[in-house]
């Protein structure tokens, strides 16, 4: 399911790369994770079956696991809003009722391993995103670093920025708090995932404000927002076996269509990408996935 239509029951206020967002009331939003998938900032023409449900369940797992206030409103949406019952086939298993908060306008990225272009930069200058990194000998693992980016509008590209630039966008005091919280959350998740045979190479968090309290929002530590690697098959300085959409990125690159609009994935690529997401869910939660 790549789009939703609640026929005006609640107004659709945003349609992102993956989520359709409806306004329930002045203080409440309904997030619906569709099966859309994007790579290189472009949405594919077709989706990954039940991907939105996997993202939703995994986000719920991490919201419960991580020691920070989040935007979730607990309870059955169909009991709270009986008018949604007729849209159960669109909403069940892929919807989150959340508090409407003031969003912090940063993509909060934490990197614990040197990946991709970062590895190329490191081998030249021993820096990652301009941040000095010491010697990395036996692995690409580093002390986690905060590498923010801008939050681009739909169809635009996020832009990597420095901590100092982020300070100017949100204020240094708030940015310092965000950096510490994000690195602490990443570290807790990284250490847990390591016990499940998964390396979290990097991840993207998003935060909102409830007064001056920083609140975790959006999706959390999913294959869409993170790089998950197999610890057992890890190889220094090489392309890693991953449980995320790197598989799709690799296919797009190999076929010369990375970043092009309107590209449809062959069925086998969609199936194999879904399997990566299922493996991430099962390994991290210890639960068997059921469509």
From Swiss-Prot:
Pathway: Purine metabolism; IMP biosynthesis via de novo pathway; 5-amino-1-(5-phospho-D-ribosyl)imidazole-4-carboxamide from 5-amino-1-(5-phospho-D-ribosyl)imidazole-4-carboxylate: step 1/2
EC number: 6.3.2.6
Protein name, UniProt field: Phosphoribosylaminoimidazole-succinocarboxamide synthase
Family per similarity comment: Belongs to the SAICAR synthetase family.
Catalytic activity: 5-amino-1-(5-phospho-D-ribosyl)imidazole-4-carboxylate + L-aspartate + ATP = (2S)-2-[5-amino-1-(5-phospho-beta-D-ribosyl)imidazole-4-carboxamido]succinate + ADP + phosphate + 2 H(+)
A Gene Ontology cellular-component term: cytoplasm
Keywords assigned by UniProt, alphabetized: ATP-binding, Ligase, Nucleotide-binding, Purine biosynthesis
PROSITE patterns hit by this protein: SAICAR_SYNTHETASE_1, SAICAR_SYNTHETASE_2
GO molecular function: ATP binding; phosphoribosylaminoimidazolesuccinocarboxamide synthase activity
Domain of life: Eukaryota
Enzyme class, spelled out: ligase
InterPro entries noted in UniProt: SAICAR_synt/ADE2_N, SAICAR_synth, SAICAR_synthetase_CS
Biological-process GO terms, alphabetical: 'de novo' IMP biosynthetic process
